[in-house]
Design a protein with these regions (language model features):
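Structural micro-motif
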Residues: 29-30, 113-117, 132-142
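Bacterial N-terminal signal peptides that target proteins for export
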Residues: 1-8
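Short active-site neighborhood of thiol/selenol oxidoreductases, capturing the structured segment around
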Residues: 43-68
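Structural microenvironment flanking redox-active thiols in thiol-disulfide oxidoreductases
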Residues: 62-110, 127
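Thiol-/selenol-based redox modules, centered on thioredoxin-like
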Residues: 137-174
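Bacterial N-terminal signal peptides
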Residues: 8-17
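N-terminal "domain-start" segment that seeds a small globular fold
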Residues: 21-42, 63-67, 115
Length: 174
């Protein structure tokens, strides 16, 4: 009985440490190999050249933060010579009963309209390499400096206060 209790306590401590590590910022991250919309290998664009605003999105919840993201895009609130933004579709966490190729086609039709850069992560490559923790059913917004430091992360629906913190953090990188 004592062994089971000790194992449970140990497991809880390990999970807490992993969760805390996943959220500690700033921290170094590396350029990760992902896929383009044609399922070809690709690296994160502008890595080391510009600061990056990355939207890592579970396709099950593409509308989380939609009003805020639309506001940023339409007002060009975070546009600047030192920052670029792009999206990465978190395909692994999608429960959609459609093949990944259909999700890629939907994304491709959207990029044709707005010129956005969208990549795909078919197997948690980004979330694992960067120790992001659970990103299922989350619209994850991140800021990475051109030096490769993850300086901001928000997962899920952002409060007004969190939106303001994001804008303040991004303003420093423009």
């Amino acid at each position: 009985m004592k062994i089971k209790t000790l194992l449970l306590v140990f497991a809880a401590v390990m999970l807490f440490n992993i969760s805390a590590e996943a959220q500690s910022l700033p921290r170094r991250v590396r350029n990760v190999e992902v896929q383009d919309l044609d399922a070809q290998k690709a690296r994160l664009p502008w890595w080391g050249e510009k600061n990056l605003m990355i939207f890592y999105v579970d396709p099950d919840v593409p509308k989380q933060n939609d009003e805020f993201i639309t506001h940023i895009e339409e007002t060009k609130r975070l546009a600047g010579p030192n920052i670029e933004g792009f999206g990465i579709i978190n395909l692994k966490d999608s429960w959609y009963p459609v093949p990944d190729s259909v999700i890629r086609q939907i994304a491709e039709s959207r990029t044709a309209k707005n010129g956005a850069t969208i990549l795909c992560d078919p197997d948690h490559w980004v979330s694992s390499a960067w120790r992001l923790g659970d990103c299922n059913d989350k619209f994850v917004i991140m800021l990475v400096t051109k030096a490769g430091e993850l300086v901001y992360i928000s997962k899920g629906e952002m409060s007004v206060e969190e939106q303001q913190r994001f804008i303040e953090a991004a303003d420093k990188l423009r």
